[in-house]
Design a protein with these regions (language model features):
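Phosphate/oxyanion-binding active-site loops and adjacent basic polyanion-contact surfaces
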Residues: 1, 27, 64-68
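Active-site metal-binding core of divalent-cation-utilizing nuclease and nuclease-like domains
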Residues: 2-52
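Catalytic cores of nucleic-acid endonucleases
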Residues: 32, 38, 45-46, 50-147
Length: 147
């Protein structure tokens, strides 16, 4: 899913960096899934962190966004030090959740709209997430590893 989002953004002209290492204000190591640099706005950069969660009745769009902002906003100064060519940009953290059963929230739809990505890719991404979830379950059930 992360690689697909990276590819879609790259096709739109964004410069994307994958698995960006950084350190937060407390010295904890973090890894940003996608650092995307906007080609059309010299003032914007995006820290994009998609995640897969089991769907609940909670507002997962809001929960994931708050969680990701809490994790990655304290890393922005370190990212600016590591990438001085982007130091003058305003950074925005975007947390995206994909449901482990193939669902998506409004946040994903809004992300596709904001970045002018074709929505026809959403079902393929959701299907990939679902297939990966099934594969993980299969490995847990049929693993030869005994505790």
């Amino acid at each position: 899913m992360k690689h697909r989002l990276n590819a879609l953004l790259t096709e739109k002209g964004f410069t994307c960096h994958d698995e960006v290492e950084c350190v937060d204000e407390d010295g904890s190591n973090r890894r940003i899934d996608i650092l995307a640099i906007d080609p059309g706005d010299a003032n914007k950069a995006y820290i994009i962190d998609p995640t897969v969660r089991y769907e609940t009745n909670d507002d997962l769009d809001t929960i994931v966004q708050i969680e990701k902002a809490r994790i990655y906003e304290p890393c922005i100064e370190d990212v600016k030090r590591r990438y001085p060519q982007y130091a003058q940009r305003d950074f925005e953290v975007i947390g995206l959740w994909f449901g482990s059963r193939g669902s998506i929230g409004k946040g994903v739809k809004n992300f596709f709209k904001k970045f002018k990505l074709e929505k026809k890719h959403i079902p393929d991404i959701a299907e990939t997430v679902l297939a990966d979830s099934i594969n993980i379950l299969h490995n847990h059930i049929y693993s030869n590893h005994t505790p």
